[in-house]
Amino acid sequence: MNELRRTLQKRIKDKEALVGVVGLGYVGLPLVKAFLKKGFAVTGFDIDRRKVDMLNQGKSYIKHITAAELRPFLSTKRFAATTEFARLTDMDAVLICVPTPLDDHRNPDLSFVLTTTETIAGHLRKGQLVVLESTTYPGTTDEEMLPILERGGLKAGRDFFLAFSPERENPGDPVYTAENTPKVVGGLTKDCLALADTLYSQVVVKTVPVSSTRAAESTKLLENIFRSVNIALVNELKMIFDRMGIDVWEVIQAASSKPFGFMPFYPGPGLGGHCIPIDPFYLTWKAREVDYSTKFIELAGEINTAMPYYVINKTLEALAEKGKSFKGSKILVLGIAYKKDIDDQRESPSLKIISLLQKKGAKVEYNDPYVPESSGHREYPGMSLKSVPLTAKRLRQADAVIIATDHTSYDFGWIVKNAKLVVDTRNAVKAGSKNVIKA
């Protein structure tokens, strides 16, 4: 056995290994918490000074991770956040949890991963384990990261260790957390796999070792493409059934009674979050290298991307029946987070809906108990809004109220009672109300 592997493996099992997490967002911070709870000392790295300062003051900027969960670890000095990346040298394991978005042409943007890898390479030492958790296309770890990390003369699998283990974070999920969700792990070599598997097995309920980093990278893509294409299917069925006067939600509920061969997926105003709207296009891009066109995956993406336009059209039809157009109409959007009971706005369909309404001349406001303000979006640089109070008067004054996110705290019966027109994209309101349309 490689002596460096033996030494690090012992440090991990003895909970003496120092863990560094790069990227303290919706993936990185839950991972930090998971390692802290299992007794490891963790340093969080981020370029955002505001996040670092808040964490070091015992405050949290993610609603489902409370300050009370972090403060005990600060007092024992087992956790610290920093913008000083020179401290990476002190880490035994470095876990990368940075964004992997798409560029303006919907091609993979690996700039965050590559910049982080360059930074790690500048501080890499013998005996370290580097793991990428960010979702990406097959080959990123060995084609993109490996040459950068080996540039200084150290050899992966001999002098340092490299692995890929895809994050499976589901923000705000009260049941499945970083700790009780199985972890897929793929290593560049057998020693790389063994170390990464040892590390995560200290923290998660179960590890799932696979044969390579590419197999691990592909696993995450399969998971999210599976969801994307099935959501696209029910979104298309929603539009078809609507024309036939059939309630797609009733149909899905009835089909769910079949105990085998069926898994329910639900339509909505479009996909949101950092994974499902983005990840399929990573495989689409990579597939071109092997001369393959991912028609099925791309079609699903087109359907899901079109859903905000469907919501807009349904709203316009309902307003037209009342002799109104979008221009000058007051529209209240309920929920700007991409799903209920969280504060995550990434890729939220609400943002697209608001943008489309504004372009058509509507006076748009939003309410979201989890998101007090919305600004700084890459795709919508001019958007800067603050959540307005949800009152009976505001509901009555709105020409249309769009339920874009079905937060549990919303009293939908009260909303329907006070609103002139409700456009329900989440099946939040029972059928039968004359002022409610499904979209």
Give the positions of each predicted feature.
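Structural/interface elements that position substrates and couple domains in central-metabolism enzymes
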Residues: 1-439
